[in-house]
Amino acid sequence: MNLATKNTTIQNEIFTLTNQRALFWKKEKALILSDLHIGKTAHFRKNGIALANHIMKNDLERLSILIEYFKPEKFIVVGDLLHAGDNSDVDEFCTWKNQYSNIKFYLVEGNHDRISKTLVQKLCLDFRANQLKINDFVFVHDFDKSIEDFQITGHIHPGIVLNSAVKKIRLPCFVQTENQLLLPAFSEFTGLDTKNLPKGGRFYVFTDSEIHEI
């Protein structure tokens, strides 16, 4: 895995964007990401659609590399940790997570996070709510116009279309505006929305090896 980074300053705080679909907040020592959709592959297999199990394994391997690199004290998921409740993929995720018991685990719930009391205990969550506020930043799955503070959000799975001489290329991105930082979906097993993006923003587009502002 090639890790490329680019710093951006928001409200006098340094955030590190990565080409591996995650964000690091230096001051808070927090690794931040959105839309893992754990359980999506198992859900499809259960419904008769054959998918390789390596999809989620690859996501977790990337996450492990990010944890080893940044050494976070907090792990913040800005919604859609899960895709379809409890299944075998969730068991695998919990086994993976147990090796990082020293990291506090914060879940901002998304529209897919249907979590029972039993599943809350299984996931060993340190925090679970619809919003998380740290200093002047609010973490919420989907942008909320009623919130005055700067919002860090997910949900959209943002992407951008670039035109080359041969074809159009769709790439994931971060989008930063005056009051929002929109995160890409962490899982690679997701689509891209290239239309419903915040207006007037800066786009940080990335590939497997690079990240650039455009």
Where in this protein do the model-derived segments appear?
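Extended recognition/assembly regions associated with phosphoester-bond processing machinery
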Residues: 1-78, 82-214
